[in-house]
Amino acid sequence: MVDERSTPCYCVTVANVATPTHPLTEMGFLSKKASTTINAGSSGGGYLSVSKLHDGGSVRFALLVAQPLEGYEAWGANVEGQSKPFRFDFEPTREDVIHELGEYEPREGRGGPGTVDVKFFIAAPVYNFDSGSVQVMSLTQKSIIKELDQISQMDDYDDLLAWDFNLSKKGAGLLTEYTLRPVPRKKGSQEHIDAAWIEARAAGFDISRLLTGGNPFKAA
């Protein structure tokens, strides 16, 4: 936690003088734009990548569906070194992964040579408050998935779609820790959330395309 130390302010009070405000700032030292730039993680394209949050960074989002897409995920790399995920709606064997990846080389699992790295995942469309748009959040981090599941089982949060969530990251590598916290819906945001979600669905959004390597936001 940052230790905020106050410093004395030597001021002269002038009556009836309006205080200028930063056009992008409601409160705080930094403008909204600067604060978002410093604190936000990667939200390029239509995906919210929580793993790319920097140490101390956070992101605020709202879930748009009551149930996520669930499955298993394996990553592979081709001869050019380009990597991409392959997803399954069942728990695949090593042979299943090798067959599905084709020319892509699967990542080695924790068991060493001869094993493949397969992880359980959930994915859901969310409204990212930083980008002001609908994005896909795909999670394999067990700690985040467990926290989300625990929150969903609390009586106070029986309707997860009525809440915002603040996800923060601390540390890096094997020492990474994530904290997920439900917070009240941001004032005045529901209209923007609804409009963005309606627009995404009208454009053909279908998250199940992740299972076939497609684009959830539009058909091929």
Describe the residue ranges of each PLM region.
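Beta-strand-rich binding-surface signature
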Residues: 123, 164, 177
